A protein has these predicted regions:
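Glycine-rich, positively charged N-terminal anion/phosphate-binding segment
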Residues: 4-14, 29-105
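Alpha/beta enzyme core
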Residues: 43, 92-123, 127-176
Length: 176
């Protein structure tokens, strides 16, 4: 194998005002992407590391475990937090807290969690099926994040299952 074939050159990833030089994003994983794991991944040169999923309501209530989850090391160049919520009010309040306290440079919303304990409550991958609620959450999140020009992304799946495909409609809503 020649040296050109062993090194793939990809353009940086642009997220609003942010530039991720190495366009590799570590997906948020509950119980995995804690500070220590993100630090280990940074040492090996990835680009963007998102915290474990934290619920909007727990942030609003300032639950100690949730506040710990959104802590970042001083050398994390892009502080990225993933928020999960099932109502626009708490998602908005959680993002406002993150913005006002300067706790993140990037926010990701979780509409992709397939865990039954999440989807049976109408959250995660099940939420985009409820287009009015999905729209309200996304619009509220964008409004709050834009108060400090913080880029917002959405993690989602193709749908709840093969009979409930939501990604196209959800992507259009998020884009608009």
């Amino acid at each position: 194998m020649n040296s050109e074939a062993s090194h793939l050159k990809l353009p940086p990833l642009k997220l609003g005002k942010l530039t991720v030089e190495t366009p590799v994003v570590l997906a948020p994983m509950a119980g995995v992407t804690n500070k220590a794991f993100r630090r280990l991944c940074r040492e090996y040169g990835g680009g963007l590391y998102v915290t474990e999923m934290v619920t909007a309501r727990a942030l609003v209530e300032r639950k100690p475990e949730s506040m710990r989850i959104i802590e970042h090391d001083a050398d994390e160049q892009i502080r990225s937090i993933q928020i999960y919520g099932v109502d626009a009010v708490n998602v908005g309040k959680a993002i406002r807290l993150v913005v006002e306290e300067d706790r993140a440079d990037h926010i990701d919303l979780n509409f992709g969690c397939p865990a039954p304990k999440v989807t049976k409550r109408g959250g995660g991958a099940a939420l985009p099926w409820k287009t009015d609620l999905f729209t309200a959450i996304v619009h509220t999140a964008v409004k709050e994040a834009s108060r400090n020009d913080i880029p917002l992304t959405i993690k989602m799946r193709k749908g709840i299952d093969d009979d409930h495909i939501t990604f196209l409609e959800s992507a259009k809503i998020a884009r608009d």
